[in-house]
Amino acid sequence: GMVMSLLIAGNSLAQPDFAPFPNFSPHGWAGVTVAADESGRMDVPLLFQYDYPETVITIDGEQRSVLTSGCGTTSLAMAVQYYRGESASQATPDALFQYAVDEGMYGGDGLGHSALSNIARLFNLRTEWRSGSESRILRWLRDGNLIIAHMGTGMFTENSGHYILLVGVTPDGKVLVNDPNSELISLAFPVQTLIDQGKTEEPFCFLQPR
């Protein structure tokens, strides 16, 4: 994963001292810290896209797989396994991606919001895509429910879109994440930073059991 060079800032918070993408200002990392206390992290399985490199479909000569295009199904698979436990062991990132392909939901980039909602419904999960306020996001996570976040250019993606899963809150009110494409799981993010880097008008999918 991404190797983070950290420096201890004068305020004794560990601050990343670089921007991983050239088009993203290091100031965007302000307030991102190494999570000192992860007691608020929900017991969510950690799955990575790069563990699923097998081609699922070829579109215009391009081989597509969970590795290239499955951040959405990987984020959703983690959520399904969290909510449904052993009964959802078949809900792997590649199985969900294959389902999306079979159902004609996949056109060559990532999956859209409605596709992820349709797949979630198979597992009796309710989804609501919202703009998300700081208070609602924190309350939702503290209640033990997950949020899929569709991130735009910034810390999680260079120029396209990328889905991550919000999986908890630190005692000082920052958000813990499972990123299916990196090992940024040791970091805690200010809610406003996630809101600012949202890809769409309604980038947050609030998940809960039906």
Role assignments for model-derived ranges:
Residues G1-M105, T153:
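Active-site-adjacent structural segments surrounding the nucleophilic cysteine of cysteine proteases
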Residues A19, N23, A30, A36-E38, ...:
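Noncatalytic regulatory segments and standalone regulatory/sensor domains
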Residues R64-T73, S89, P93, D109, ...:
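Solvent-exposed, acidic/flexible segments
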Residues V66, T127, L184:
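Short, flexible active-site loop motifs that bind/organize anionic cofactors or intermediates
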Residues P93-L96, L116, I137, L194:
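Hydrophobic/aromatic residues in well-formed alpha-helices
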Residues F97-G132, R142:
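Mid-length scaffold segments of soluble, non-membrane domains
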Residues Y106, R126, L146-I147, T200-F204:
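A general structural signal for well-ordered secondary-structure junctions
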Residues W129-L176, S186, P209:
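Active-site-adjacent substructure of cysteine-protease-like catalytic cores
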